[in-house]
UniProtKB/Swiss-Prot annotation:
Organism: Nanoarchaeum equitans (strain Kin4-M)
Matching NCBIfam families: PRK04223.1, uL22_arch_euk
Origin: domain of life: Archaea
One GO term describing the cellular component: cytosolic large ribosomal subunit
Subunit structure: Part of the 50S ribosomal subunit.
Signal peptide: none
Gene name as annotated: rpl22
Keywords: Ribonucleoprotein, Ribosomal protein, RNA-binding, rRNA-binding
Biological process, per Gene Ontology: cytoplasmic translation
GO molecular function: rRNA binding; structural constituent of ribosome
PANTHER family the record matches: 60S RIBOSOMAL PROTEIN L17
Lineage, top ranks: Archaea, Nanobdellota, Candidatus Nanoarchaeia, Nanoarchaeales, Nanoarchaeaceae
RNA-binding found in the keyword field: yes
Protein name: Large ribosomal subunit protein uL22
HAMAP family: Ribosomal_uL22_A
């Protein structure tokens, strides 16, 4: 498989045919892209606890608006949901890619998500109540890299963290 970034000092994970909605996975990926891994995991845990809504940028038809504190002010959008199933699976995969990075000798507190993407998987059929039904499937790819300039003890605004993650991504490009 060809990648757009150099794979030195990058831990990656590619999950095939996860039983989650592709649309939900795309919106969650947009929310946590270029963030530190620990912060992304905290945000997803808040989504599971229904404290923080996932902002829906692309697939926002008939999506309700949320209260002022439920969507992070960085995103400047009011549409949001709490996609539990997709959040659980993506959180599980983030834990897995963190273990991959630890095996490569990286510091887990300085990891940034430099690439996360969700694509449609193989949509097969399953039997439900004697009838056949379409099965949801999503491919998920995640890459994390260690940012030497990041100090986990310091408090950064979300915009600055996204900028740091994007700079790290651009430095890894071939």
């Amino acid at each position: 498989m060809r990648y757009s970034v150099s794979l030195e000092n990058v831990a990656k994970l590619y999950a095939h045919n996860l039983p989650i909605s592709t649309k939900h996975a795309v919106e969650i990926a947009k929310m946590i892209r270029y963030l530190p891994l620990q912060l992304a995991k905290e945000m997803l845990q808040k989504v599971l606890d229904k404290e923080l809504a996932v902002p829906f940028f692309r697939y926002n038809r008939d999506i309700p608006h949320r209260k002022k504190g439920q969507i992070h002010p960085y995103f400047k959008i009011k549409h949001g949901r709490f996609p539990e199933n997709a959040t659980k699976w993506i959180l599980k995969e983030l834990n897995s890619v963190e273990k991959n990075a630890i095996n490569l000798g990286m510091d887990p507190n300085k990891l940034f998500i430099v690439h996360i993407a969700a694509h449609k998987g193989v949509r097969g059929y399953t039997s439900v109540y004697g009838r056949r039904a379409r099965r949801k499937a999503t491919h998920l790819e995640i890459m994390v890299a260690e940012n030497k300039d990041y100090d986990p003890s310091k408090k950064y605004p979300l915009k600055e963290l996204k900028r740091m993650g994007h700079k790290l991504f651009l430095s890894l490009k071939k």
